């Protein structure tokens, strides 16, 4: 009768499932996390540790989250969790940006414009309610990603206390002398009816008219004299400008030239024109005239204050000097309309040029505009061209495709328009230079971010912080009705209003009667009707939120982390405000990630049909697969995602999960309190495996500390697939399954597996949070009660390295891995040739040089367990048969023959020692010892 020895084996057993089934299991885990107040438990466990503060850049409270939101929140969550594991107290307070035009437009669509069907106060309340609904919707999706934070107490820019603190930040800006009021060209959206911040402007291709325009000289004789060209040439004499915005011609008040450039008086066909010397040929070619003659040359400086007739109005304009004039294109003479261009405005101010003020808020010419009254600016383009042709001052017209500013919300072209606005001055109190100095104190990740934001700060205009909107934090200022000067008690008044807003929200300002605060001054002072730019809202959260939340304990902010578009947006507005109020940058480190594109590198769009939504990914693959994709992608560039890429992430996930499952299954019955083996008593290979885990942990900790999450994933995969899966875990199966359950040989192995599992689950937790939690619940209990959640724990402290006196050190095992790899290669050839079925069916002879012979001999009879064959002979390389193929590893050669021995049904090894025990005639001697004896002894493997 055949005896079944299966029950004498230590077969792996665990309730940890092979399949993750993440999409189904994760929601239940989330429910458990929140029912048990996991975030608060992390806070309690971290109390008193050194702080690391990552301040959440608030997403806009409108619409569903997209894949870019998911990337951003997951990266933040990985950092927060890894910092906790590294021993920091790292709170996470999520936030939302709640004021501004997109919400206004949505609410307008629902209830109509304010002061039409609904009062402004009711409209603001509807905006507040709409924003709150949007926050709740986005919050659920963020939580589903596995992001841990104080979701019950997020910061909202529309919270009454935050609105009040935003007003207080404005007070600090004023106190430090950075605010001024001026009429200045700002980005103006005709659809919004409001100014736009730099970050709200996108550049898209647009087809515009391209025109060359004549400005006839007031005195041709005077110009001839300047060029020393009296009596030379013929025809009328004009300055030529080029523009792609014909509608700005009615507002022209000057022609700008560069003082240092050379200008020519040119005979161009039958007329004389002034052009920059470098551009004469290109202009002649553009207007289609071959006959040109240079009549004279002067520096731009010599043309200053020469006068030319406006092309179609009855006044003359001066030539002025400006450094912004270049020879990159055009004519070298720049049409200057101070209302409609920042350079024009700046240079116009130096010459005291008048502002035309011809374009109203809705983008139409005012009623007194000759020829174009009531026309929209873009509607006026062909009319201006027609007028220029009519009066004979159009030299050339054509179409040009060029990059043009558009509103990021409406995707429509915008204009520059001078309006009375409130500004934070970049030059007042040295703000620009101070900000540039602060940038150098910050660590920028990746480092090119520093040069990028430096260039932006160097070139940015004064910040227009006022908006003409209904739903926003009001600029709670009182100005003199005639002089527009701020009230002398502005700072005290701001604080009084802030207290009211703290109690009742921003509506408290709109409900306020001036007399309540101003008394008799109400006769001469009025309330400013403007609201603050929403970038002021979010840009001030370093103060309005972080400085006031008890969790942050007054600490400085360590990190801002957002997409690379935020150099121009949140990073910029925060830097400007913090420098203006506190003379320092608000952050120590700034990390930026790239945009998400499809597998072909294309931007996601509905028209292409390549949009990947986080909701779909989680429903199909689960949150951990999405998290693993984020972590494994180099975030410093564009982040590619597609179904195929996510499937690859799922494959990687399975390898990690299978490793964890193997560990747990082989820890079945292991009680660390009872069974843990001291390092010095462990089998050599087990000590090496723990040391290998320590090396991996050190690299993983360093990668987490430097935000190199793709390196974490690569190291995790190498550990699971190569060092463990392809080597250690493969080798120990025999010892784990066949030795006596409580033998030192097996307990040594389980001790190593336990240490590795304790470390592995912590490495995974910041990235594969759901799976780490699942593993944590299946780990054996320790002497002290195991913490309820892995997320409260620091990286594992129980790993140990190899001692200096360790003979079988890491270098030894690395050499052995090479030998094993070569043996496996030869075994594979034999398998493919049908000479053997598996490695245990083989008897291997290794012909080795002296170095390798000494190396292999150290394992004695246990070498076969490392090579996973039934028998190994070691011979001198000089004995290698002549017909044996050379090895790919220099210094050894390998031959394989099929074993003629019998197969043991218990361990599957082929052995000459089967039948040594009459009671167990089918077992090999080793299995007899393990079944009825004291158990097999292992020293090395």
Curated annotation (Swiss-Prot):
GO CC list: cytosol
PROSITE patterns membership: AA_TRNA_LIGASE_I
Binding, Zn(2+): 904, 907, 924, 927
GO annotation terms (biological process): isoleucyl-tRNA aminoacylation
EC number, UniProt record: 6.1.1.5
Catalytic activity: tRNA(Ile) + L-isoleucine + ATP = L-isoleucyl-tRNA(Ile) + AMP + diphosphate
Residues reported in the UniProt entry to bind L-isoleucyl-5'-AMP: 562
Highest taxon in the source lineage: Bacteria
NCBIfam families found in the cross-reference section: ileS
Name of the protein described by the UniProt record: Isoleucine--tRNA ligase
UniProt source species: Haemophilus influenzae (strain PittGG)
Designated gene of the protein: ileS
């Amino acid at each position: 009768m055949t005896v079944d020895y299966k029950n004498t084996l230590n077969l792996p057993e665990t309730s940890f499932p092979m399949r993750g089934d993440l999409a189904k299991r994760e929601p239940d885990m989330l429910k458990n996390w929140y029912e048990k107040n996991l975030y608060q438990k992390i806070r309690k466990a971290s109390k008193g540790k050194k702080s690391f503060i990552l301040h959440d850049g608030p997403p806009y409270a409108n619409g569903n989250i997209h894949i870019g939101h998911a990337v951003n929140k997951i990266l933040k969550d990985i950092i927060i969790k890894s910092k906790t594991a590294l021993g920091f107290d790292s709170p996470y307070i999520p936030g939302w940006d709640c004021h501004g035009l997109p919400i206004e437009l949505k609410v307008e669509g629902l209830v109509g414009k304010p002061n039409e069907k609904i009062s402004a106060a009711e409209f603001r309340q509807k905006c507040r309610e709409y924003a709150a609904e949007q926050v709740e919707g986005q919050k659920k999706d963020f939580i589903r990603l596995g992001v841990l934070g104080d979701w019950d107490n997020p910061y909202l820019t529309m919270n009454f206390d935050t609105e009040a603190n935003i007003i207080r930040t404005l007070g600090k800006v004023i106190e430090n002398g950075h605010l001024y009021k001026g009429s200045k060209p700002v980005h103006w959206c005709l659809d919004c009816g409001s100014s736009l911040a730099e970050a709200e402007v996108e550049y898209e291709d647009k087809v515009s008219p391209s025109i060359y325009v004549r400005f006839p000289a007031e005195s041709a004789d005077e110009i001839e004299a300047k060029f020393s060209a009296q009596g030379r040439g013929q025809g009328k004499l004009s300055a030529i400008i080029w523009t792609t915005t014909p509608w700005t011609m009615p507002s022209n008040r000057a022609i700008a030239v560069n003082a240092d450039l050379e200008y020519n008086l040119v005979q161009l066909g039958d007329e004389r024109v002034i052009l920059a010397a470098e551009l004469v040929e290109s202009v002649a070619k553009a207007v289609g005239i071959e006959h040109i003659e240079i009549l004279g040359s002067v520096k731009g400086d010599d043309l200053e204050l020469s006068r030319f007739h406006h092309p179609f109005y009855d006044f003359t304009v001066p030539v002025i000097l400006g450094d912004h004039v270049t020879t990159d294109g055009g004519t070298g003479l720049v049409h200057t309309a101070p209302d409609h261009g920042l350079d024009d405005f700046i240079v116009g101010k130096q010459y005291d040029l008048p502002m035309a003020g011809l374009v109203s808020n809705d983008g139409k010419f005012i009623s007194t505009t000759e020829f174009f009254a009531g026309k929209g600016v873009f509607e006026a383009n062909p009319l201006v061209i027609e007028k220029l042709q009519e009066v004979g001052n159009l030299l050339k017209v054509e179409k040009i495709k060029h990059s043009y500013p558009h509103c990021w919300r409406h995707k429509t072209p915008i204009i520059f328009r001078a309006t009375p606005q409130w500004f934070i001055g970049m030059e007042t109190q040295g703000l620009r230079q101070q900000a540039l100095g602060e940038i150098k104190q910050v660590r920028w990740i990746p480092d090119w971010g520093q040069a990028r934001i430096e260039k932006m700060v160097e070139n940015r205009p004064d910040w227009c912080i006022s908006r003409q909107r209904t739903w926003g934090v009001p600029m709670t200022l009182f100005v003199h009705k005639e002089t527009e000067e701020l009230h002398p008690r502005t700072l005290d008044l701001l604080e009084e209003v802030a207290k009211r807003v703290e109690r009742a929200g921003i509506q408290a300002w709109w409900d306020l009667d001036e007399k309540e605060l101003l008394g008799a001054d109400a006769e001469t002072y009025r309330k400013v009707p403007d609201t603050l730019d929403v970038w002021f809202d979010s840009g001030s959260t370093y103060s309005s939120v972080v400085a006031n939340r008890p969790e942050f304990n007054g600490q400085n902010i360590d990190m801002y982390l957002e997409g690379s578009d935020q150099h121009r947006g949140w990073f910029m507005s925060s830097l400007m405000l913090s420098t203006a109020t506190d003379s320092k940058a608000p952050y120590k480190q700034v990390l930026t990630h790239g945009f998400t594109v499809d597998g072909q590198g294309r931007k996601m769009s509905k028209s292409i049909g390549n949009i990947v939504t986080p909701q779909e990914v989680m429903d199909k693959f689960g949150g951990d697969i999405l998290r693993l994709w984020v972590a494994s992608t180099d975030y410093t560039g564009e982040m590619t995602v597609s179904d195929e890429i996510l499937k690859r992430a799922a494959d990687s996930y399975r390898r990690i999960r299978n490793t964890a499952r193997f560990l747990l299954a082989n820890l079945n019955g292991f009680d660390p309190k009872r069974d843990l083996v001291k390092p010095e008593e462990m089998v050599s290979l087990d000590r090496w495996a723990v040391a290998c885990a320590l090396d991996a942990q050190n690299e993983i900790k360093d990668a987490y500390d430097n935000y190199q999450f793709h390196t974490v994933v690569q190291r995790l995969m190498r550990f699971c697939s190569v060092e463990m899966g392809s080597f250690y875990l493969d080798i120990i199966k025999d010892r784990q399954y066949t030795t006596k359950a409580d033998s030192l040989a097996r307990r040594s192995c389980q001790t190593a597996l336990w240490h590795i599992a304790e470390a592995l689950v912590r490495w995974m937790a910041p990235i594969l949070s759901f799976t780490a939690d699942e593993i944590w619940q299946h780990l054996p209990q320790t002497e002290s009660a195991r913490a309820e959640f892995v997320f409260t724990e620091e990286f594992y402290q129980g790993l140990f390295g190899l001692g200096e006196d360790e003979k079988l050190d890491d270098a030894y095992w690395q050499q052995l891995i090479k030998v094993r790899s070569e043996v496996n290669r030869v075994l594979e050839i034999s398998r493919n040739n049908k000479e053997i079925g598996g490695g245990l069916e083989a008897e291997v002879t290794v012909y080795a040089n002296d170095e390798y012979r000494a190396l292999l001999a150290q394992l004695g009879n246990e070498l076969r367990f490392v090579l996973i064959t039934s028998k190994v002979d070691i011979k001198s390389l000089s004995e290698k048969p002549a017909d044996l193929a050379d090895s790919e590893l220099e210094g050894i050669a390998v031959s394989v023959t099929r074993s003629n021995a019998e197969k043991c049904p218990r361990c599957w090894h082929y052995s000459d020692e089967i039948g040594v025990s009459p009671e167990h005639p089918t077992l090999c001697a080793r299995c007899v010892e393990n079944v009825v004896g004291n158990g097999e002894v292992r020293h090395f493997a």
